[in-house]
């Protein structure tokens, strides 16, 4: 089940489902400025900007942190989170002066480690992480417009 709250779409299904959000529509200028500002306010630092002919992506560094209670309850003792903000060019918005708009999305990669398999695994059934990511998505979407 999905609901629209503010300018972002959030999944309300429980379980180990990846966190993905629709953020709204941005210009190239406010996309980079707003994303950088909101991520820094939430202790996420940009590691990489990737651009191609149809999209732009901002990728954070891994936020290595103490596991949340839901992660320790599941037997994990190490956790790290990374955010991807993707902006896809809306071709219908091109203008004479090269202006255009982006459709913006956020995806979260949360990895945890238990030591059993000697590798990190994705884990999303973490209420505190979801709350934190909902807050970041809401903060971003408040600075974009919602045309969906």
Question: Model-found features: residue ranges?
Answer:
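Ser/Thr-rich, low-complexity intrinsically disordered terminal regions
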Residues: 8-148
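C-terminal motif of bacterial Sec signal peptides marking the signal peptidase cleavage site
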Residues: 3-6
């Amino acid at each position: 089940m999905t609901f629209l709250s503010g300018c972002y779409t959030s999944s309300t299904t429980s379980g180990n489902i990846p966190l993905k959000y629709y953020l709204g529509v941005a210009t190239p200028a406010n996309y980079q400025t707003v994303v950088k500002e909101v991520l820094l306010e939430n202790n996420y630092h940009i590691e990489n900007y990737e651009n191609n002919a149809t999209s732009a992506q901002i990728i954070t560094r891994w936020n290595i942190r103490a596991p949340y209670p839901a992660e320790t309850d599941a037997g994990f003792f190490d956790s790290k989170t990374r955010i991807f903000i993707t902006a896809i060019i809306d071709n219908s918005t091109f203008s004479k002066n090269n202006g255009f708009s982006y459709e913006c999305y956020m995806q979260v990669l949360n990895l945890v480690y238990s030591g059993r398999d000697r590798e990190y695994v994705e884990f999303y059934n973490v209420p505190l992480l979801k709350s934190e990511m909902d807050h970041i998505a809401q903060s971003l979407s408040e600075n974009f417009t919602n045309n969906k």
